[in-house]
């Protein structure tokens, strides 16, 4: 059971109602994360704004999901693991074996570049972005740029907002996402 109210369009603070309507229209349901964030309309606005910016960063859609899933796993957020697994499998059509490797933080054997991204993301989180020159160089040697490195930090910051909000609230996973938990 959630430690925070999970708002609907009807119960949300006035400042969050339009955002919830937009999410409902876009997804066909309101993810419980959004209902939780509606308790703080500025947190919900931040999520939507930063999410939009993250969606147009220098990483590909697949690479952004690697960052999001890796962060969710490291931060212990089952809700976000499920949500981003659904995106990876259903929207991006990634192979289940690849998604399972990302979720397990194991080596991504079939794609060295994505593996370098996952390792970099993991290291950014665990070392609070205090990477050695060799750790950074391994990322660049895989074909990534300094812009990509900063966009990983952007993705991790978005994930941290979501993961921590879900962990704080003990957000239950929506039925629409249960299959991907």
Predicted regions span which residues?
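Hydrophobic alpha-helical segments
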Residues: 1-181
């Amino acid at each position: 059971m959630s430690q925070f109210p999970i708002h609907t369009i009807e119960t949300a603070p006035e400042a969050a109602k339009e955002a919830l309507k937009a999410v409902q229209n876009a997804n066909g349901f309101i993810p419980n994360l959004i209902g939780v964030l509606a308790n703080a309309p500025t947190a919900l606005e931040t999520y939507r704004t930063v999410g939009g910016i993250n969606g147009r960063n220098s990483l590909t859609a697949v690479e952004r999901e690697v960052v999001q899933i890796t962060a969710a796993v490291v931060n212990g957020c089952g809700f976000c693991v499920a949500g981003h697994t659904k995106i990876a499998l259903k929207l991006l059509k990634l192979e289940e074996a690849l998604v399972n490797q990302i979720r397990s933080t194991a080596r991504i054997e079939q794609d060295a570049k994505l593996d370098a991204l996952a390792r970099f993301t993991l290291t950014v989180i665990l070392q609070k972005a205090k990477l050695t020159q060799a750790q950074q160089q391994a990322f660049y040697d895989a074909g990534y740029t300094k812009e990509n490195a900063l966009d990983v930090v952007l993705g991790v910051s978005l994930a941290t907002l979501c993961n921590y909000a879900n962990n704080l609230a003990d957000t239950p996973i929506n039925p629409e996402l249960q299959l991907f938990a």
